[in-house]
Regions:
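Cell wall/extracellular polymer interaction/catalysis modules
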Residues: 9-87, 91, 98
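N-terminal low-complexity, Pro/Thr-rich disordered segments
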Residues: 1-33, 190, 194-216
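Domain-level detector of nuclease and nuclease-like folds
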Residues: 87-216
Length: 216
């Protein structure tokens, strides 16, 4: 299941990874590297089946996050589902395959990751990040487009989901060894200081994809 929203100042949710605030304070601070050389293809083909369950990553996340799910041809291709409460708007959003009302968001945007360490990785690690369920969330398309590739210093969701969202970004950056800018770290600490017991999410896939996957 994806991280759940928690009220500011409560105990938070998570999988036992410790306090998100403590983890945020431990992240390495560096300047943003140039975006030169970035392309989506550097992170492999979109939605690769890196967990080898015969379903692509996008459908895996839709199945995880939507309710009332219906499939086309078996139990992989999600044709319909309901996002009961969009983390980025609080609204109910209906997913229909081929429509554009729902996105799968990379919590840590791939271009942001590229500028904060991923440009120096091998392809296996970049592919893993792009398909790690820890870094993926089903959201409404409209608010996600407003986020773009912003980090915590430039975009956060409404207050009801803010602590959970920032904790998830911290978890991904810590897991993969990505750095943060000084403004980004300050923003993370500011948010998580309002919910200092917010747990750090854990889990997801290994940080290297199987050798059969390749990226440009």
């Amino acid at each position: 299941m994806p991280p759940e929203a928690t009220a500011s100042g409560d105990s938070g949710t998570g999988s036992g990874g410790g306090a998100a605030l403590t983890a945020a304070e431990s992240l390495t601070v560096k300047g943003r590297a140039p975006k030169t050389g970035y392309s989506r293809e550097r992170f492999g083909s979109a939605w690769a089946d890196t967990d080898s369950n015969s379903c692509d990553t996008r459908d895996d996340i839709l199945k995880r996050d939507l309710k009332q799910v219906k499939f086309t041809d078996g139990d992989c291709k999600v044709s319909y589902g309901v996002l009961e409460s969009d983390p980025y708007s609080g609204k109910e959003v209906v997913y229909k395959r081929g429509a554009s009302l729902v996105d799968i968001d990379h919590l840590v945007a791939l271009s942001d990751a590229w500028q904060k360490g991923a440009k120096y990785w091998d392809a296996s690690k970049r592919i893993a990040l792009a398909n790690d369920p820890l870094n993926l969330l089903t959201v409404g398309a409209s608010p996600n487009r407003s986020k773009g590739d912003g980090d915590t210093a430039t975009w956060v969701p409404p207050k009801a989901y803010r602590c959970t969202y920032v904790a998830a970004q911290v978890a991904v950056k810590k897991k993969y060894g990505l750095w943060v800018t000084s403004a980004e770290k300050a923003a993370m600490v500011k948010v998580l200081s309002t919910c200092s017991k917010q747990a750090l999410p854990t889990g997801g896939n290994p940080t290297n994809a199987p050798a059969r996957f390749h990226a440009n």
